[in-house]
Design a protein with these regions (language model features):
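Positively charged n-region of N-terminal signal peptides that target proteins for export
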Residues: 1-4
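C-terminal motif of bacterial Sec signal peptides marking the signal peptidase cleavage site
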Residues: 13-16
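Bacterial signal peptide processing site
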Residues: 18-21
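Post-signal peptide N-terminal segment of mature Sec-exported envelope proteins
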Residues: 25-46
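A cross-kingdom marker for long, charged
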Residues: 32, 199-264
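Short, structured motif recognition centered on aromatic/hydrophobic residues
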Residues: 35, 49, 106-117, 125, ...
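Mid-chain, structured segments of secreted extracytoplasmic proteins
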Residues: 63-104
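Extended amphipathic alpha-helical interaction segments
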Residues: 110-221
Length: 264
């Protein structure tokens, strides 16, 4: 649902994807297609989404892209001699600020879009949610395969960023895979429980057909709930991932660090 309500999927692609020209040229169509897959948009809704996304993309190209380029330049210069926790904190704070600016811009249009949904479109969303939930439950049931898939993806991502590893390094990577991707069912099932609860609340809100201001307030509160001071579980997860980044940073060779910097 996150990628539906704020059109945020597109903006996250922009911040992480190197093919930004493609995104800026076709992002409005992509978001329209994505939303249509959940709601089955009518012509008026489709036109609204594409027109507003063109405006948001132009804003992003003019305002946020230069900031992002400066951000990457800073990371490249700081990363040459390794990273520190304070540098990671600073980088994450800048990323959060970017998120807030993006959300503040998208929320009014997202709220307006939600006020134009019909009962049938909300039912379409519910069916799509049910399909995705079924797929997730299948993954939970095949937990061993899911864990193995994550481990394989982890190694592929490491090689994409840092290049090839020697046999000694591969032993350490295998150790991290075991430590970081356990077969514990609790995190997966807890996320599924939270997902189902959130979906029930969202569908109930949509079916109450509130006005635009109510949707804006709800979206603002929802995005603020991602903040570190509110969501302690998220804070713990972010800290854990930062520590893992520092572990990897100390583990790689200077040549592998340069490889990662070039990948930026």
């Amino acid at each position: 649902m996150k990628k539906i309500i704020l059109f945020s999927l597109l903006l996250f692609i922009i911040t992480a994807c190197t093919t930004t020209k493609f995104v800026y040229d076709y992002g409005d169509k992509f978001v329209s297609w994505q939303l249509d897959s959940y709601f089955e948009l009518n012509d008026e809704q489709e036109d609204f989404v594409e027109e507003r996304m063109k405006i948001h993309l132009e804003w992003h190209r003019a305002e946020e892209l230069p900031r992002y380029k400066r951000f990457l330049t800073d990371i490249q210069s700081r990363g040459e001699d390794g990273l520190t926790m304070s540098e990671l904190d600073d980088g994450f704070s800048r990323f959060e600020a970017k998120q807030r600016r993006t959300f503040e811009r998208l929320i009014p249009d997202a709220a307006f879009f939600l006020t134009k949904l019909s009962a049938e479109q909300i039912n379409n969303l519910e069916r799509k949610m049910a399909e995705e939930n079924e797929e997730m439950l299948e993954k939970v049931e095949n937990r061993h395969e899911l864990i193995q898939e994550r481990r394989e993806e982890f190694l592929e991502e490491m090689e994409d960023w840092f290049g090839e590893f020697d046999p000694v390094q591969l032993v350490q990577i295998n150790k991290w895979q075991t430590e970081w991707y356990t077969e514990s069912s609790e995190p997966i099932e807890r996320r599924m429980e939270y997902r189902l609860k959130s979906q029930t609340q969202i569908l109930a809100l949509l079916r109450s057909f509130p006005d635009k201001l109510t949707f804006e307030k709800w979206l603002s509160e929802w995005t603020r709930s991602w903040g570190r001071e509110i969501n302690s579980a998220r804070d713990a997860r972010i800290l854990r991932n930062k520590k893992r980044i520092l572990q990897v940073d100390k583990f790689i060779t200077p040549e592998q660090r340069l490889h990662a910097i070039r990948e930026l």
